[in-house]
């Protein structure tokens, strides 16, 4: 499998297994089919699994957890996401912590490689997005359940 550099982070397979299909976003499949799909993808050289709690209401993350039972192959990277939506700025850090904890539990992992805050974080409040949300993600990197974080921020007009 051809590899490519993921930004300044690591080399990963040119193909990524996204969680939409195994989260049953496009139609019903069995858990067994989804687990087999993830395992086969990794066997064939896919090294990046892109998950999110919104892919099947946590099902995609649960499938990865079932596929590897906490024993992810060393060369496989996992990303997941969290959506803050209109969270009160005073509750952002707790919202991120609890969302990440739930994802890790479903994935049966102690850490993920890349954690995205998925969406415009607080579209009407740019300052909260930049000055509250970014610092609230730093604990995850320092405490090591996440290797890297990435924010999708609204642009300030």
Which residues make up each language-model segment?
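Active-site beta-loop-alpha junctions enriched in small/polar residues
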Residues: 20, 52-54, 81-85, 117-120
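Active-site mouth loops of central-metabolism enzymes
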Residues: 21-31, 82-94
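Generic structural signal for well-ordered alpha-helices
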Residues: 38, 61, 65, 100-101, ...
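Active-site groove signature of glycoside hydrolases
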Residues: 107-127
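Conserved small/polar residues in nucleotide/adenosyl-binding loops
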Residues: 149-155
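Active-site cleft segment of glycoside hydrolase catalytic domains centered on the general acid/base Glu
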Residues: 90-93, 122-145
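Short, acidic/polar
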Residues: 29-40, 92-105
């Amino acid at each position: 499998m051809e590899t490519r550099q993921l930004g300044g982070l690591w080399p990963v397979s040119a193909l990524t297994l996204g969680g939409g299909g195994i989260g049953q976003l496009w139609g019903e499949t069995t858990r067994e089919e989804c687990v087999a799909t993830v395992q086969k993808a990794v066997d064939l050289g896919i090294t990046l699994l892109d998950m999110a709690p919104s892919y099947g209401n946590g099902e995609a993350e649960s499938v990865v957890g079932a596929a590897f039972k906490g024993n992810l192959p060393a060369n496989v990277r996992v990303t997941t996401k969290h959506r803050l939506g209109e969270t009160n700025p005073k509750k952002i850090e707790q919202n991120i912590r609890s969302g990440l904890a739930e994802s890790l539990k479903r994935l049966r992992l102690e850490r993920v490689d890349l954690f995205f805050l998925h969406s415009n974080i607080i579209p009407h409040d740019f300052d909260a997005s930049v000055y509250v949300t970014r610092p609230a993600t730093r604990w995850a990197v320092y405490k090591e359940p996440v290797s890297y974080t990435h924010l999708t921020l609204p642009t300030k007009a």
